Amino acid sequence: EPMVWRVFDDRPFEFLLKIVKKDAQTGNPVLKAGASYKIFDMEKEEYVEQTVFYPKKETISVFKTNEEGYLVTPEELKCSTYRIEEVKAPEGFVRQGYEMSLYEGETVISPLEVTGKGIYKENSKEGIVITVSSDTAHQIDPDTGAVIVEVEQPNDEQVGSLTLTKTGEQSVEVKGDSLLAKAKRLAGKIKDAVIGEDTDTGVFHDFVYEESAVEGATFELYAKDTIYSPDGAKDEQGNPVIRYEKDDLVATLVTDTEGKAVVNNLPLGSYYLKETVAGDHFVLNPEQKEFTLTAKDDTQAVVYEGVAYKNERQ
């Protein structure tokens, strides 16, 4: 009868940690290098430091993703509880802890929905905490046999918010005779000229105008350049996924009683505005106004932009 062999492996469970950067809106990996993380060992109460030997030997405590949107620690970690802290997000994304969401009442509007509704409020997310033991789900690298524990860390896309204001000179007061009286006075002048008499009292009208909000003006917002999905995703032909082609209509804005119109959740990029309806008693403004939404850094969840139009009265 053959002997039964049992192999016991008493070596401690050690693993390589793989962090995958994801776009929280599309669910796709972010195919950009540069997301940076620190890994805090909550049991030892210290940050993980590891040694790399290429291109030169050095000790690192910040780990960075590659162009495929992930990183693998160069050395193995032991079983413990770890907190993953993002210290830099890739271009076009909000660093973990600085998120904001667009709310309509209690409902969160998806950042992918371009809309004139909602108010932005802080909605920061906690860092990822993972406890790893020998029972933790893991992968085995087919080439090296190394144990790999994978975690996904999503980021919100940075967005823009445009506020457009429209003003123009509008009559607020008429000094002197009423409009009816003015008409009668003009008729009187004509009569005087016919009969050869002068009955003009010398009273005249002074119209007073003030610059104020224009309601009902309509504008169209277009993409000035092609705007791509910030996650770097590609279509079946290998081309970058496009959100808006150059000169695509992105939104239509109509000013309210305060002369304002807002559009939220615009992808970062360059745009231009055209006025299509001037509002009552105003001349259409032919000026095309351009602007670019660019975040100052990865802590800016929303880039705010203001554009003002002024129209001449008819």
How would you describe each model-predicted region?
Residues 1-314:
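Solvent-exposed loop/turn and edge beta-strand elements of beta-rich ligand-binding domains
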